[in-house]
């Protein structure tokens, strides 16, 4: 077993010193850039426009270029790109012409993992929260792990940190299958669901086979921690030839939860382990889906030999992660009263449903008012009926226009079509919202004392939420 208090000296990447990131403001890029900067590399990056992320990186001493120009990479020894970057980008073109190595972000993440005990968290849903919980538990041992997370960890004020221990905890991104570049020693698979189907030619069997390949990237002495409550994870389980521990509400799992009680945003439960007394857990996050996320980290921590007290403290002391059921200050209404206000990143029907269930369990007396922004026309098209079914379960629904993420509009996969289909279902009469100004006006008429307002989605609705929190309605 690796000593979790070991001070790790990481070998350098030999002749590589200057590392340039194209699209450095992206959530998957900025964290890797920050860790490399803190390791002593000369890091630079370019993006189309300034953001709070690029501003923060600049404050750390990372050179930021606004716009993509070939001169940005004249001094680069390696160029890091995400799949969102077009091959016609002038920085990529110049790099190829001058034989500069161009690597995907997952390849660079794999390099960060190479000399550490990598813990990679995969799954269609719950990656960011589970990765954050894992980092919190390891930090509770007294030695900070390195982590790269797809959201801002409240306790650290960042989505990445260079730690002092042997461990690196990171999300493993299946959206472009780039997680196959990673070679961790421990993996978590939270679930497998239909999403990013364009990557897999619309074939869900390919999705499942890719997860199997990901698990088999483990060394023979590695460990896969899998959620058996998920039917697709259960399906791949017999095909795996690596050591496995399972978790779930299902009591046939190696690690399972009983006596689950949710009060407001807190969940309490007993975590049963193969050996030893059950752990009494108090988790400051609502919903059974977060109980599952916590169980995954309990399984990994137990395997690593983390003390029960550190597991309990790491979970109880978890301060949350940005846009994952993030409570804002109460929103003031024109009549002087206020409503509970939450912002959440979930943008897949399964994620939205989990959030709705968590709210119903924790605040059953409140009327649920959701402002939802669909993310991508392809996702809206592919999961259209699921969106109709799930969004019909709120009390008041306001639908913003689809956040395209660069996609061309698809007929019948827009917000007005979604409104019509939800209205036909008969449970709720949705309101289409054309602008942020319209949203403020509608909310001032719709909201009433005792409501719970949630802004939901992965596009720029996070900024809408921030503006509402700052300026009110």
UniProtKB/Swiss-Prot annotation:
It comes from the Bacteria. SUPFAM superfamilies: MurCD N-terminal domain, MurD-like peptide ligases, catalytic domain, MurD-like peptide ligases, peptide-binding domain. It catalyses: UDP-N-acetyl-alpha-D-muramate + L-alanine + ATP = UDP-N-acetyl-alpha-D-muramoyl-L-alanine + ADP + phosphate + H(+). Keywords: ATP-binding, Cell cycle, Cell division, Cell shape, Cell wall biogenesis/degradation, Cytoplasm, Ligase, Nucleotide-binding, Peptidoglycan synthesis. It is found in: Cytoplasm. One of its GO terms (cellular component) is cytoplasm. GO terms for molecular function: ATP binding; UDP-N-acetylmuramate-L-alanine ligase activity. ATP binds at residues 123-129. Its EC number is 6.3.2.8. Its main location: cytoplasm. GO terms for biological process: cell division; cell wall organization; peptidoglycan biosynthetic process; regulation of cell shape. Pathway: Cell wall biogenesis; peptidoglycan biosynthesis. Cell wall formation. Belongs to the MurCDEF family. This is UDP-N-acetylmuramate--L-alanine ligase.
């Amino acid at each position: 077993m690796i000593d979790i208090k070991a001070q790790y000296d990481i070998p350098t990447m030999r002749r590589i010193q200057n590392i340039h990131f194209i699209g450095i403001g992206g959530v998957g890029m900025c964290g890797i850039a920050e860790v490399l900067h803190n390791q002593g590399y000369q890091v630079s990056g370019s993006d189309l426009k300034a953001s709070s992320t690029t501003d923060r990186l600049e404050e750390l001493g990372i050179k930021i270029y606004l716009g993509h120009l070939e001169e940005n990479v004249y001094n680069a020894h390696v160029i890091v790109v995400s799949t969102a970057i077009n091959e016609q980008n002038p920085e990529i073109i110049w790099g190829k012409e001058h034989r500069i190595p161009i690597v995907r972000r997952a390849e660079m993440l794999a390099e960060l993992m190479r000399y550490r005990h990598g813990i990679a968290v995969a799954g269609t849903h719950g990656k960011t929260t589970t990765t954050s919980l894992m980092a919190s538990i390891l930090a509770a041992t007294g030695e900070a792990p390195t982590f790269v997370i797809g959201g801002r960890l409240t306790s650290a004020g960042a989505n990445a940190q260079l730690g002092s221990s042997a461990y690196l905890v990171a999300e493993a991104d299946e959206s472009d299958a780039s997680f196959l570049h990673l070679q961790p020693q421990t993996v978590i698979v939270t679930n497998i669901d239909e999403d990013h189907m364009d990557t897999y030619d619309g074939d869900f069997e390919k999705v499942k086979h890719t997860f199997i390949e990901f698990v088999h990237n483990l060394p023979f002495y590695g460990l896969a921690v899998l959620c058996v409550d998920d039917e697709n994870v259960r399906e791949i389980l017999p095909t795996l030839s690596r050591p496995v521990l399972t978790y779930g509400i299902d009591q046939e799992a190696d690690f399972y939860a009983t006596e689950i009680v949710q009060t407001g945003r807190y969940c309490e439960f007993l975590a049963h382990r193969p050996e030893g007394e059950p752990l009494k857990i108090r988790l400051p996050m609502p919903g059974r889906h977060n109980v599952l996320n916590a169980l995954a980290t309990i399984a990994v921590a137990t395997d690593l030999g983390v003390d029960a007290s550190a597991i309990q403290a790491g979970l109880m002391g978890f301060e949350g992660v940005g846009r994952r059921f993030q409570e804002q200050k109460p929103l003031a209404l024109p009549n002087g009263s206020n409503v509970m206000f939450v912002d959440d990143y979930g943008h897949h029907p399964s994620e939205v449903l989990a959030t709705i269930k968590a709210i119903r369990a924790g605040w059953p007396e409140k009327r649920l008012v959701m402002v939802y922004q669909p993310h991508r026309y392809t996702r809206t098209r592919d999961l259209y009926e699921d969106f109709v079914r799930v969004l019909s379960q709120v009390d008041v629904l306001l639908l913003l226009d689809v956040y395209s993420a660069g996609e061309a509009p698809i007929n019948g996969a827009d917000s007005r079509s979604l409104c019509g289909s939800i209205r036909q279902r008969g449970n709720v009469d949705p309101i289409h919202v054309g602008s942020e100004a319209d949203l403020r006006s509608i909310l001032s008429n719709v909201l009433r004392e005792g409501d719970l307002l949630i802004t939901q989605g992965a596009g720029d609705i996070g900024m809408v939420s921030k503006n509402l929190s700052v300026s009110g309605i």
